[in-house]
Amino acid sequence: MCLTNTGEHISIYAYLYGAGDAKIGKIIGGNAGQGKAIKRKFNKAIPAIANLRHAVEDALVYPIDYKSTRGKKTRITWKRHYLYGLDRRKLHVRSPHSALNLLLQSAGALICKKWIVRTEERLLARGLKHGWDGDFALMAWVHDEQQIACRTEDIAKIVCAEAQQAMRDTQEFFDFRVQLDTEGIIGHNWFECH
């Protein structure tokens, strides 16, 4: 997803992962003022993300009166240095601006871990055997991608369907309100599947 501003594009990830005005300005080939304007436009276009960022920061630090601190280095006062992840574990926060990134990275990792486990469970429940002497073998798990070798194309189709259902199981497990999906691609090597 991109936000357009006079022909320039900014990746949503830079914003979500805590890029400041200067960094966003640099990404678009501009300056901090232009970066700030892009962020303002983005927040106006998708207020839910701005609200989420503010809610996360409000849970961590006390508000700063920016008018009284203009031009001075401000010191934040922490309420707490942690947030809770999807699995209720404490996530220790380094800085308020990186807190949303921490939540997103944690959620992504937990979702993918659960998805991998549920895929395996579902395939075994279908009577398939895991291993090089069996029907399928997990060759790689990279970020949000599984690479699974299958004995036949029919088994590969089953793996794709079960991986999709495993993702929906994961959505339900974490009570995730956004639909989670995956895409299965069948090929003879990683290049064909990626």
List each model region and its residues.
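Conserved catalytic core of nucleotide polymerization and phosphodiester-bond processing enzymes
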Residues: 1-194
